[in-house]
């Protein structure tokens, strides 16, 4: 095996180990956020939970806030990709879009429940609202020929807050309804 092939294999192993370590750290932070706010969480607690030393933690993150921001950024990258992949078909296939959205929420329910919960990051919700606003509000104003943009902003705030509340309730009641069922419920509420 040539030196470059050995290096490529080592990089793959390192990448897998890094991914595993970050996944364990993410899980530990999620568990701790169920119990207390980020301000009370120490790097030592996270490191102890996943049986690593603090130095390993600091190879990946500056502190717990940097870690939380990094995790949130990953979610927003997923959301942006999600919106860009579905933006053209949103009207024709809203049910498909919402099913995909609720499926994503279910797959990441532990983390999203914590982020939307009492110990979560309030700026996460604000970033989520702003992202949807940037993606949808201006397009909707033009598309629906809105004359009173201020009134439409109130409508938007009302709808987004309601959607977030609906998602919170679903997550907090252990997602009894399927993503398909939740998509139908949300679509009915938005159309009324």
Describe each model-derived feature in a short phrase.
Residues 23-31, 35, 49, 66-86, ...:
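Alpha-helical structural segments
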Residues 1-5, 161, 169-192:
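C-terminal peripheral helix-coil segments that are non-catalytic and often amphipathic
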Residues 32-65:
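Helix-turn-helix
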